[in-house]
């Protein structure tokens, strides 16, 4: 089990961040905050892409909402969650985020 912090920075410092727990191929988002408009969205899009490429099979956001549904979030029933979680924690996965992957122009309001 690893506790992870994923962050988006701009010229003024931290723009958005998420504290998470990684267990095998399961990623559990615990807390997310943003200081700049849309920075949290950039974090989610980049993180989901990195999780997919790293072999993660479950990203538990804890609570679905219409905003997260725009990014592909879907609810699954308790039985499906249990099966997916049991498989995910036994699988290896890795997260490789590239520093400086996006320029601030990609998300800063114009």
Cite the ranges covered by each PLM segment.
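Aromatic (often tryptophan-rich) hydrophobic motifs at membrane interfaces
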Residues: 7-9, 14-76
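Short, small-residue-biased leader/transition segments that mark boundaries at the very start
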Residues: 1-2
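Terminal substrate-recognition subdomain of acyl/acetyltransferases
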Residues: 58-110
């Amino acid at each position: 089990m690893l506790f992870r912090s994923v962050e988006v920075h701009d010229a003024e410092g931290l723009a958005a961040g998420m504290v998470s727990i990684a267990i095998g191929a399961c990623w559990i988002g615990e807390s997310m905050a943003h200081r700049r408009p849309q920075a949290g969205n950039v974090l989610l899009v980049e993180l989901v892409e990195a999780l997919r490429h790293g072999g993660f099979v479950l990203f538990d956001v804890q609570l679905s909402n219409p905003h997260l549904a725009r990014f592909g979030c879907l609810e699954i029933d308790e039985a499906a969650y249990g099966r997916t979680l049991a498989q995910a924690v036994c699988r290896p996965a890795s997260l490789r985020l590239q520093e400086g992957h996006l320029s601030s122009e990609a998300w800063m309001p114009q």
